[in-house]
Amino acid sequence: MAVVTMKQLLDSGTHFGHQTRRWNPKMKRFIFTDRNGIYIIDLQQTLTFIDKAYEFVKETVAHGGSVLFVGTKKQAQESVAAEATRVGMPYVNQRWLGGMLTNFSTVHKRLQRLKELEAMEQTGGFEGRTKKEILGLTREKNKLERSLGGIRDMAKVPSAIWVVDTNKEHIAVGEARKLGIPVIAILDTNCDPDEVDYPIPGNDDAIRSAALLTRVIASAVAEGLQARAGLGRADGKPEAEAAEPLAEWEQELLASATASATPSATASTTALTDAPAGATEPTTDAS
């Protein structure tokens, strides 16, 4: 059974790239066509790369590895935290602190300090101190919780990282590459595919797209954990969400992708470029 369907990708707007004036030429091979000045990503390739990334994550976790989820842009913060928490993996959805990977020994000391402050607060360790001291300790704890709370249980650098928007998270990607940690990421049309080991061509700006693809990676982690525990294979297919009706041109794209006979690229391109200008518009082109 497919990990995710073409219909789910279309419903979440995964096929919308950036404006044609904002692109990375290295992404040309992942682009199907353009419509109304917006690049349309080839979802057939997206499905293929999702399968590769899914298998890699599943095997990595099954053999004892961990995956760090990274997404600090507003569109990704909620899904990154929710999905990582669901499968017990570390995450960063606030500002990435330089050295989180390359200087992990120092970061680990800060994590120990966070746990120390939490223990003091819970066991009455703040008692007997002045109000000013208590306020200072509380602020320190809250600051550490905000910046490091998602990785509180990360005892060592991860086996791989999942990234939403490699341009925004370029520091995290750079640190992972420096340490030889595999990078799995959504590749929008303005990204550099050379920086990613397991790319998934798609829209990294739409909330639903980022959530769907993050859920796919989390499902791969869950299946890997079950395999590690000897519980057998789980169905990693994400649950379908209520979706808005597809525009006519998107319905044609879905039909051409699911037809028993492979349609010609010319016919598919015509179906897209001839679509009415008032069809479903892409998400805001913001990083």
Swiss-Prot record:
Pfam families: Ribosomal_S2. Transmembrane segments: none annotated. The keyword Transcription regulation does not apply. Disulfide bonds: none annotated. Residues 254-277 have a biased composition (Low complexity). Coiled coil: none annotated. GO terms for biological process: translation. Gene3D superfamilies: Glucose-6-phosphate isomerase like protein, domain 1, Helix hairpin bin. One of its GO terms (cellular component) is peptidoglycan-based cell wall. Keywords: Ribonucleoprotein, Ribosomal protein. Belongs to the universal ribosomal protein uS2 family. This is Small ribosomal subunit protein uS2. The lineage of its organism: Bacteria, Bacillati, Actinomycetota, Actinomycetes, Mycobacteriales. The gene is rpsB.
